[in-house]
Amino acid sequence: MKGRNQKIGGGGFHHVAMRVKDFDASVLFYTDVLGFKKTIAWGDGDKRAIMLDTGDGSCLEVFAGGSSELKPEGAFIHIALCTDNCDAALDRVKAAGMEVTMEPTDILIQSSPPTPVRIAFFKGPDGEVVEFFQNK
């Protein structure tokens, strides 16, 4: 089976999780603006959480209860979302009032062989850094 990791018996990410200050605003942004679909939700108040399907079965898990004093755990830098049209995806983000930190840019990843991609970055509703990633 293509893409199957024989060492752990699977492959790919199931989900990436983040804790946010404004749960409702974050869920609204990822569902209404980016088109993610709610799969399961649980908890109440600052214990709320939800899984949002990004479109291919992998999910963004959003937890309530974040604060400005909350220190990030681990070393994640950003989350990258696959798109077929980086420019159109970023237009949706701009229309929603999000801060764009890098306009769509063509780059050549210096791999062997070199890999051409188009990328853009923005800040989500809770300040998280999100990348749109388009294979060319």
Where are these regions (language model features)?
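Beta-rich catalytic cores
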Residues: 12, 48, 75, 118
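Mid-chain, well-packed structural core segment of small domains
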Residues: 79, 86-87, 98
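Vicinal oxygen chelate
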Residues: 1-9, 51, 94-136
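N-terminal beta-strand motif that seeds the catalytic metal site of vicinal oxygen chelate
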Residues: 1-24, 76-83, 133-136
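Conserved short beta-strand elements that form part of the metal-binding/catalytic scaffold
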Residues: 37-73, 123-125, 129-134
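Core segments of cupin and vicinal oxygen chelate
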Residues: 11, 18-60, 88
